[in-house]
């Protein structure tokens, strides 16, 4: 949503749904249109528009608290359709290009996810490491570059039930996570059973 400063009380809106066209309407009309989002207890998040949206979205695939790979896709949502129209090939999103966790261009994001953002999320939500899904992902947009010219990132959403397709490296990461958790559970069970065996 963008306020039209030359027209009091008017806004320009663009739905993220494929094929949508920009619309101009009074703010009150827009709020009425959004009422269904609140009817079931939902909410609307005021997320600032990112001018670097045409550079694409980065999907960071996680297994537990470790990065399992990345996907980079040139998206078209929230970008006005080209002159060829919303159904033209030019208006369609690009393919998601998959990368392993060691991809050089995403190492800053990997460090943030593993060392800062995931631990902060776990602390805020009261989630321990074994409770994290063995495969989940977080989608990011590029934010403005910092003073040193490095990329910054803005979170779009977190997915825990619709993560596929996944990078080629991700199945091995999932297997490692499952193995570690099973071994920990086995060790815990063995330690708990040891006093019972000694009594016998």
Language-model regions, residue ranges each:
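Phosphate-binding site of ATP-dependent enzymes
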Residues: 2-128, 141-144, 151-154
């Amino acid at each position: 949503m963008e306020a039209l400063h030359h027209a009091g009380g008017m806004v320009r809106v663009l739905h993220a749904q494929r094929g949508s066209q920009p619309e101009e309407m009074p703010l009150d009309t827009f709020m009425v249109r959004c009422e269904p989002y609140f009817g079931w207890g939902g909410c609307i998040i005021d997320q600032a528009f990112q001018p670097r949206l045409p550079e694409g979205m980065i999907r960071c695939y996680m297994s537990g608290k470790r990065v399992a790979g990345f996907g980079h896709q040139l998206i078209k949502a929230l970008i006005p359709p080209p002159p060829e129209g919303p159904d033209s090939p030019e208006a369609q999103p690009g393919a998601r290009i998959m990368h392993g966790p060691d991809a050089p261009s995403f190492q800053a994001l990997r460090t943030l996810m593993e060392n800062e953002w995931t631990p902060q999320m776990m602390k805020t939500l009261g989630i321990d490491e074994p409770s994290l899904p063995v495969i989940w992902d977080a989608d990011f947009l590029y934010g403005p570059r910092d003073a040193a010219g490095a990329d910054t990132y803005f979170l779009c959403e977190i997915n825990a039930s619709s993560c596929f397709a996944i990078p080629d490296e991700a199945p091995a990461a999932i297997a490692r996570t499952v193995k570690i958790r099973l071994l920990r559970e086995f060790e815990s069970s063995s330690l708990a059973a040891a006093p019972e065996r000694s009594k016998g």
